[in-house]
């Protein structure tokens, strides 16, 4: 039962975070947002194809195929070993998250939705990056800006 709750929450969080990426790109078109949106789209399509095509992945691991952060850099493991394309997606997402941190710290531009859903999206798996991201915000953003973010529960 708990596995299904985690699965449903993961799918909802991933979907909402993707929607926020779309809105973020629509409201403020820039290269980082475009690359992030493109990578999200490619990884979602690839995950769906991989989930549908790989019969060697068990039911639990099918969920992991949908959520890179649940299994980290190793990704889904089938009979042939770890999926090499998964590592590419994982590393690309790691670079994009780092670019997001730079965007916030240098440009000091981040929507409350972006930060909130980054936190939600990372809560189930690789929360370390999200914690570093939020801790960096707390330490380096101007106090008034962080207070505005804190009002929204971040």
Swiss-Prot record:
GO CC annotations, alphabetized: membrane
Keywords (A to Z) from UniProt: Membrane, Transmembrane, Transmembrane helix
Transmembrane portions of the chain: 5-23, 34-50, 88-107
Membrane topology recorded in Swiss-Prot or TrEMBL: Multi-pass membrane protein
Subcellular location: Membrane
Domain of life: Viruses
Record-given protein name: Putative membrane protein ORF51
Taxonomic source organism: Ictalurid herpesvirus 1 (strain Auburn)
């Amino acid at each position: 039962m708990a596995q299904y709750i985690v699965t449903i929450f993961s799918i909802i969080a991933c979907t909402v975070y993707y929607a926020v990426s779309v809105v973020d790109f629509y409201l403020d078109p820039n290269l980082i947002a475009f690359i992030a949106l493109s990578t999200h789209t490619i990884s979602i399509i690839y995950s769906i194809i991989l989930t549908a095509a790989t019969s060697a992945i068990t039911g639990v691991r099918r969920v992991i195929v949908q959520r890179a952060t649940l299994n980290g850099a190793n990704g889904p493991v089938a009979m042939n070993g770890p999926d090499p394309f998964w590592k590419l997606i994982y590393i690309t997402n790691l670079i994009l998250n780092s670019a997001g941190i730079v965007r916030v710290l240098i440009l000091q531009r981040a929507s409350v939705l972006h930060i909130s859903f980054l936190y939600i999206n990372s809560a189930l798996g690789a929360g370390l990056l999200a914690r570093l991201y939020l801790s960096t915000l707390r330490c380096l953003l101007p106090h008034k800006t962080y207070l505005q973010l804190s009002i929204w529960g971040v």
